């Protein structure tokens, strides 16, 4: 893909000019928009819409407001606008320009802000925490005797998180006058309007009801935003600015306010095609050139060009569990009218579009409110329905963990479908990498954990989940992966039984993740060259193991369990406990994640954490030698 960007020297030149700060901000913001597109398309993923809506505010905060305070903290709580924040920091010389081509690379910029990046103060990506963190910053600086100002940028979708409203309770009471909350009120979250997902009502008066001085303005007009900020600042009280923005602002055909009823927004996340990139760059380039001409300032710039890395094409047939799940849940819902699907603002990412179309009365959109969603599911189950709760695994198993436990104590049945499970995709970063979900769901009463390893297993395991009397957590890999053509012939769904994919001797490799299984299969080829012939087992059951199967399939083997999870709290601990109760000759070693997962390309991260097929082979050979 042919990409264009604006070199750092033009930002430096523009910043050196003595011109109207509002004009300067407009020019810098549109120049940043060009570089945001470059950054996201070079990386292959990122969030364009949210970055475009907030870049004007970010540049005003970092470029102008930063001059007015002894110590200014500005950060975004919503995280999706990381490319905007990075480009703003680059524009003002607070990040190295070379990082423009390093988004979602292991040696560059993570998908969501992380404190290991220069001038990033706090980690974001898990929503709802920003105001609480701001309060802690203010109190810490008061104790140190430092005058500080904290500006936290939140999203309107983020306002659905319960922690937001908890964090507002004592802001006025504690006179946290150093705090200004800015809401990026673009009226779109993810792919649909906030009104459809979870209508927020009168946001301004909600904030006012907490005793917070609140005004609204056009958040994409720096003139209006600067006046709103001055108005709030002059009141010497905790403040909030409802910045009414447009998702995708700056490129006319990306504007979210053009969305028609029933449509999905196309520029929430991901890269874009060459022709769309070229069209957007042309519009931004013309807009910047026109502003320079009309303002008669002595400034000129040129675009630079670069090719994005080629994405390697896969030769083998790839499995996609999402489409299989989408079809399977619709098929089961046709047969069983008690099935209810609950969604946490991830209808595209959890395969529920067709379900919503075909069974709108049995589809419940809960927005970004996992605790509320899980508790609703609990009482739906008590009333005789079969609720299936959907979200990303990292969010579904952590934030509403207490609610899940409460449901389990009521002896009802709820199915929890968690997507984006495991280390990959690694681009979004550790807030989205579910590598502690198995540990989080352990200890739940009457809860089985399962993970399908193929499209056909999705169908079978969903059917099993609906028939089982227990609560079920289904752990879904969300990226395509490769498996042998005969995988489904070799695998069956029998409770507590693993599936032998390839016979071997002495060594047995067991894993439950399809992405890791794919790597393990490739590692066998390398191991065979070193006269090591491992048996390979795919295990769809994460906390249920049949004793007879263990005896027949694992006894007298050196068992190497590969986790797509932290080693602590993973499947290996559970399987080792089951083995310890039997009088068997099994040596156990575990390969898995031992530190906070990195953000980067999938291959980079597999290599870094020792889970690529080459690293697996090296580790196994090392284990055998010892």
Where are these regions (language model features)?
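Non-catalytic terminal/interface segments that mediate subunit docking, oligomerization
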Residues: 295-387, 394
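Conserved thiamine diphosphate
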Residues: 145-146, 195-228, 410, 414, ...
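Thiamine diphosphate
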Residues: 96, 105-178, 347-420, 435, 548, ...
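General beta-strand structural signal in soluble alpha/beta enzymes
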Residues: 50, 76, 152, 216-218, ...
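Cofactor-binding active-site loop characterized by glycine-rich and histidine/acidic residues
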Residues: 7, 39, 51-173, 494
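Active-site pocket-lining segments that scaffold enzyme catalytic pockets across diverse folds
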Residues: 43-62, 321-334
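N-terminal capping segment at the start of a domain
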Residues: 29-45, 184-186
